[in-house]
Amino acid sequence: MKITRRSLLQLAGLAGLGIFVPACREMFAQILFSPDAPLETSPPLPQNPFRAGSKSLVAIVRGEEVPRMVARAVDLIGGMARLGVAGARTLVKPNVVWGEPPPTTTDPRVVRAVAALAKAHGPASLAVGDMSAVLSLPTRPHLEKTGIAEAGREVGAEVLAFDEGEWVKVHPPKVEYAKTVYVARAAHEAERLISVPVIKTHRSASFSCALKNTVGCVHGKNKPWAYGNDGWEPAVAELNMAVRPHLFVVDGLQSMVQGGPWSGEAVPTGIIMASGDPIATDVVALGIIKAFGRWDMVTSKGVWDQVQIRRGIALGLGAGAPDEVELVTDDLTGGDPHFVTLLADIRRNVGLH
């Protein structure tokens, strides 16, 4: 972890505050101290069951009724039964970076729909959990404020704040930056991990969707900023060697197309996406952001040229080229011309035919 003079001054300020403010003590501990965690084996790369031949499927569904959109998106890529949730410890992981409404955080309606769909397939256990950004800890108040905790409780899921729980230590293979990673035990032990990210721009990581959402499963010592400016974006991809979701259901009801991750310009996109491939998911999300033309960190380069994407491909995390991605779509509204235009923009920006 690179510590600059400015960072040291900031940490000193946090330390002083930590004497008086419990929340600051938690932030300070996450930044400076490694947890007492047992060494575990890094998870294997899960087989993507949501494929058509050699292509990773990415579903995009336009609609108005969130549960129906979520169910349809998952059905389009093969259905929840393909995931093997039955009898498995299942964790739904939204984006709860802090306590602001969507699209800063995942819409609780999407979380509820995903958790309910998983529960209908008979998991051994079901939880909804995340850890907020270090500077906004603790997580529990944000889970409550966003409505995500209530969404989980409504379907009978346990609601977890990872900063309250235990950690394990893993040494991911093939990485350059994230060589020792502390992972929330709940995420490490989940037999089926369903990531429910949002689509948004990001001032440090360029963009945030599938790969970036995994960062909420790791300790403060492993947040991407801990690896310095050069390591920020590649570390996002590398952390997916320590935590490996099995399914991505993306909240695209709104998309942040400028600013982020805390706040920014949001536009209504009215979609849900689903895929088993984080790279395929992210290039499609980038295609959406790029279509609005507001964020230079995305518009200035091709979607396959983003650092997160290049590093993820090198690590074998998913699709490596446009001919390895297939879009499957549905419009439940009966014919939205804006959706037709958006799909055309996505196909052009991702290089799909």
Predicted regions and their residues:
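N-terminal and secondary-structure boundary signal
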Residues: 2-353
